[in-house]
Amino acid sequence: MNLQVEVGGLKLKNPVMTASGTFGFGREYGEYIDLNQLGAIVVKGLTVKPKEGNPPPRVYETPCGMLNSVGLQNSGVDAFIEKELPFLRDYDVAVIVNIAGETIEEFAYMAKKLDIDGVDGIEINVSCPNVKKGGMAFGINPEDIFNITKEVKKVTQKTVIVKLTPNVGDIGVCAKAAEDGGADAVSLINTIAGMAINIDTRTPVFKNVIAGLSGPAIKPIALRMVYEAARAVKIPVIGMGGISSFKDALEFMIAGAKAVAIGTCNFVNPNCTIEVIEGIKQYMVLNNIEDINEIIGSLKVD
């Protein structure tokens, strides 16, 4: 049985990855699961300088999901290279680093800095809805997506993935902009812009007012967008958004995703990624499927 997939030149032992911002740098989850079993770890979003993030509250539970407004809190790219990367190098798992710049120059600076051993891929975050500069402001403009991708590709030999926002009219246009800029793959979707209101105080729950919705509630939207993106580009698509079971993961792959990433479910069930991997294996056995790649893009549409 072959579970190996190739995403933009990066060979993964299986198609199950972690979604950035939901798995930290793997340390905490390493106490619950064997990190070596994962297809890839996508680390928490990094910025050039340390970032405090947004004031609390940062998380708010919703029916079938959650809103978050963390604001990319992190210790910066230098601290990651010095303190976190050595830990990840001890594992036999692909490491993809999510970077979030406020300017095109910042994206290129971090990508160049991360063009080192132990880093297998770069995920360009042009889709975070919880920051005032950069983030989704880039991701809703195809020209910005193209320019950022082009500049990052100039300075790194690593696999370059562009993480797209769902808060656009045509996801295919944005995916094509990333492809035209030289991206090796696209990942989608990031969170959907949402909000919550305290009816007692009549004020927004979040200081930023707008937050990012994730979890099972967004899965049908994510699935539709992955389907559209996979039809719009020739490069691999990594699907995510509300995946909490192997059945969810298979839906994304049948729709055209070469790999999948699990996010919010990690907060609910630390074993979610492993359960999805095992579920896919069982599905393949029951359906006499020898190669996972037979499933990818196998949707039958009349």
From Swiss-Prot:
Binding site for FMN: 20, 44-45, 98, 125, 163, 189, 215, 241-242, 263-264
Pathways involved: Pyrimidine metabolism; UMP biosynthesis via de novo pathway; orotate from (S)-dihydroorotate (NAD(+) route): step 1/1
GO cellular component terms, semicolon-separated: cytoplasm
SS bond partners: none
Any matching Pfam family: DHO_dh
Active-site residues, Swiss-Prot/TrEMBL: 128 (nucleophile)
Coiled-coil stretches noted in the UniProt entry, renumbered to this chain: none
Alphabetical list of InterPro entries matching this protein: Aldolase_TIM, DHO_dehydrogenase, DHOD_1B, Dihydroorotate_DH_1, Dihydroorotate_DH_1_2, Dihydroorotate_DH_cat, Dihydroorotate_DH_CS, Dihydroorotate_DH_I
Assigned keywords, A-Z: Cytoplasm, Flavoprotein, FMN, NAD, Oxidoreductase, Pyrimidine biosynthesis
Protein EC: 1.3.1.14
NCBIfam families named among the record's database cross-references: PRK07259.1, pyrD_sub1_fam
Record function comment: Catalyzes the conversion of dihydroorotate to orotate with NAD(+) as electron acceptor.
Family: Belongs to the dihydroorotate dehydrogenase family. Type 1 subfamily.
Family annotation (PANTHER family): DIHYDROOROTATE DEHYDROGENASE (FUMARATE), DIHYDROOROTATE DEHYDROGENASE (QUINONE), MITOCHONDRIAL-RELATED
Protein name as it appears in the record: Dihydroorotate dehydrogenase B (NAD(+)), catalytic subunit
